[in-house]
A protein has these predicted regions:
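Glycine-rich, highly charged phosphate/nucleotide-binding loops
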Residues: 80-98
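A short beta-strand-loop structural module common to alpha/beta enzyme folds
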Residues: 64-76
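Pocket-forming structural segment of enzyme catalytic cores
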Residues: 43, 151-242, 313-315
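A short, charged/proline- and glycine-enriched loop
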Residues: 31-38, 99
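Acyltransferase
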Residues: 2-28, 44-45, 236-319
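A short, Lys/Arg-enriched amphipathic alpha-helix followed by its capping loop at the start of a domain
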Residues: 33, 53-65
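Cysteine-nucleophile active-site neighborhood
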Residues: 105-174
Length: 319
C-alpha cells in the first residue's frame, strides 16, 4: 500500500528509486478508491484446485478484490461437475459487456498441441481481443503466457527435449522492475512444462521486456512495456504438494518421469517437499495488483475502453 506524506518531502525521491510507492497528501485526499474487479479465466481441468491457489495468492493484498470466475463455453469439462460451473462460473457471453481492472489466464494441459488445434482457441482469442478494450492489465500463467505471447506478439512456443519439471532458481535481469519489488536477487519458482519460448525473439521485440529467467527455464517473467500484459511461464501460485501430485499421477500412468528437480530433500519422493517460493507468490501477485492495476486503472472502469483508443491514437502518431 502507498505511504502518504507531505508533498515535496525529500525522502520521496529516494524511496521512489527503491520502488516504494509514496503518495503526497494532496493526491491522497483526492484519490477515489473502489474494489478491484478481477476476471479469472480458468483453463485447468482441476478448476477447484486452481481457483483456490489463485485466490490464496490474491488474498495476500490488503486491496479489496471482486473475483469473477470464467470457464470456456466451447469445451465441456470432463473433470468439473456442470452444476458447479453453473453455480460459481460465468461464460464469456455473460461478461462481454462488462469491464475488469485485471484478468488472469491460467495454464492448460494442451501445450504439445498447436494453438490453433486447441478446441477452445477461437474463444480464447476472442477473450484476449476483448480484453484489449475491457481489461486494464492481464496476468498470464504458463501455457496461458505462451498463448498470450503468441497471440499478441507472434512469438510461438517450441517443444523442449525434456520436460522442465521442478523448482528452479532465477536471475532478475532488470535493476529495479517494480513487478519484482521485494524479491531477492535470485528467487525460486516451480515449473512444469514441455515447451518454451525463444529468448532471442523476446529480446528483439521492442514492446517486451525480459524481467527474469535462468539457463534451465529460459524466460520466466516478461512484461509488455505498456504493462498491459504480464507473462509468467512458471507457477508461483502452486501449492507445496502440487508437483508431488503431478509426479505421483504420472508414475501411476506408467510414464517415464523424473523426480522434480530441487523439490524433495535429497531427491527422495518419500520426504516432504521443500517450499522455496511462498514469498515469491505473495510478492508477484500483490505487486501486480498494486502497481499494475490499482495504481493505474481508472476509477470509472468504463474509461478503460477510451484509454485503449488513446493508446492506439498515440501509437499511430509514431508509425
Amino acid at each position: 500500500m502507498p505511504i502518504k506524506v507531505i508533498k515535496n518531502l525529500p525522502a520521496i525521491t529516494k524511496l521512489a528509486q527503491e520502488n516504494i510507492f509514496v503518495m503526497d497528501t494532496e493526491r491522497a485526499e483526492n484519490q477515489q478508491i473502489r474494489p478491484l474487479n478481477i476476471l479469472l479465466i480458468n483453463l485447468m481441468p482441476t478448476k477447484e484446485i486452481t481457483e483456490t491457489q489463485i485466490l490464496r495468492a490474491l488474498s495476500n493484498s490488503p486491496l479489496q478484490v471482486n473475483l469473477t470466475l470464467l470457464h470456456t463455453a466451447s469445451r465441456k469439462s470432463k473433470n468439473t461437475d456442470e452444476q458447479y460451473l453453473e453455480t460459481f462460473y460465468r461464460t464469456f457471453e455473460e461478461v462481454e459487456d462488462e469491464f475488469f481492472d485485471g484478468m488472469i489466464i491460467t495454464g492448460a494441459p494442451v501445450e504439445l498441441m498447436p494453438f490453433e488445434e486447441v478446441d477452445y482457441w477461437p474463444e480464447l482469442v476472442e477473450i484476449m481481443n476483448w480484453g484489449e478494450e475491457h481489461v486494464y492489465s492481464t496476468f498470464y500463467i504458463c501455457w496461458g503466457a505462451q498463448a498470450g505471447l503468441y497471440h499478441h506478439f507472434g512469438i510461438n512456443k517450441c517443444i523442449m527435449d525434456e520436460k522442465l519439471f521442478g523448482v528452479y532458481e532465477h536471475d532478475i535481469y532488470n535493476d529495479r522492475p517494480v513487478l519484482l519489488r521485494g524479491f531477492d536477487e535470485k528467487f525460486w519458482m516451480p515449473h512444469s512444462r514441455h515447451t518454451t519460448v525463444s529468448l532471442q525473439q523476446i529480446k528483439e521485440n521492442r514492446d517486451l521486456e525480459l524481467l527474469a529467467g535462468s539457463e534451465p527455464t529460459g524466460a520466466a517473467i516478461v512484461r509488455s512495456l505498456d504493462n498491459k500484459h504480464i507473462f509468467v511461464f512458471g507457477h508461483a501460485e502452486y501449492d507445496w504438494d502440487t508437483l508431488n501430485r503431478e509426479y505421483e499421477r504420472d508414475i501411476k500412468k506408467g510414464m517415464d518421469i523424473a523426480v522434480p528437480e530441487n523439490y524433495f530433500p535429497n531427491d527422495d519422493p518419500k520426504q516432504r517437499p521443500i517450499v522455496r517460493w511462498r514469498s515469491v507468490s505473495t510478492l508477484l501477485f500483490t505487486n501486480w495488483l498494486n502497481y499494475y492495476v490499482y495504481q493505474e486503472t481508472p476509477y470509472i472502469i468504463e474509461q478503460i475502453q477510451k484509454m485503449k483508443f488513446e493508446r492506439d491514437k498515440n501509437l499511430g502518431a509514431y508509425i
